[in-house]
A protein has these predicted regions:
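P-loop NTP-binding core
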Residues: 1-261
């Protein structure tokens, strides 16, 4: 049975895209069939996946935005799925999503479009991971409505620790009104400079701020320049350097997540 997971935070720069790609890669090497949905008009997940191969992603036509437009216009085209490797696929996104979002905002049942699209795809996958924009608007609600679970990424800084209340409110409103089965799998702390006491203190603040009701994963993702290097060549950090500390951390996090099931 397919599990659909949204990776979310309304703040940018907290490791959403990096986590989505590397978590998907870890699930794939564990013999799972995984589909990535880039749902951010910046298209960073599309860039990181390596499918563009030098092409400007804003020139790509077969994106998630195109599919949503066909659903808005009652044509309902099947999405074009790009293969990253044998077990990992992606539906890309680019700047066209910004225009599509404007159409979504004035569409009937605007919250339901991504769910409708994924209904026809989920039987082909073990996991579908959705990378969202740093916002709290209609595309995030679409992702929540389509999902079974949410993983929240957070960095060990004051803004990240205090800035998730609005995200949690959006989650609760979506759960109440559209998707009663939606749950938060946990909070993953990323971008950790393990050398500093400040980071360690902020990790404790994040853990205590969520309380006992929301899991904060035991494994955290350390800072590593190798992560940006891996993104530049369209590889997961484990594929780029399996002994890197971030690669090991993403592997341990994936194991921790899977033990929850």
């Amino acid at each position: 049975m397919c599990k659909i997971i949204t990776i979310a935070n309304q703040k940018g720069g907290v490791g959403k895209t990096t986590t989505t790609f590397n978590f998907a890669a870890e699930l794939a090497v564990r013999n799972n069939k995984v589909l990535l949905i880039d749902f951010d008009s910046q298209g960073n997940l599309t860039k990181n996946s390596g499918i563009a191969k030098g092409q400007n992603i804003d020139d790509m036509e077969m994106t998630i935005a195109r599919v949503i437009n066909t659903y808005i216009n009652d044509c309902e085209e099947e999405p074009v799925i790009y293969k990253i490797n044998e077990r990992l696929d992606i539906i890309p996104c680019n700047i066209d999503m910004a225009k599509t979002k404007m159409k979504l905002n004035i569409s009937i049942a605007r919250e339901m479009y991504l769910k409708r699209i994924l209904e026809s795809l989920k039987n082909n996958y073990d996991y579908i991971l959705i990378d969202t924009a740093p916002s709290l608007d209609v595309d995030l609600i679409n992702a929540f409505v389509a999902s079974d679970e949410v993983i929240i990424t957070a960095t060990p800084d004051a803004f990240s620790a205090s800035g998730t209340k609005a995200l949690f409110k959006t989650y609760m409103q979506t759960k109440k009104n559209f998707n009663k089965e939606l749950s938060i799998a946990g909070v993953l702390i990323t971008g950790v400079d393990v050398r500093t006491n400040f980071a360690k203190d902020m990790i404790q603040i994040i853990r205590s701020s969520w309380g006992e009701g929301i899991k904060v994963f035991n494994n955290v993702i350390p800072l590593s320049v190798k992560v940006k290097e891996s993104q530049a060549v369209g590889k997961s950090i484990a594929e780029y350097d399996k002994n890197n500390k971030a690669a090991i951390a993403y592997s341990l996090f994936t194991d921790e997540y899977l033990k929850l099931k």
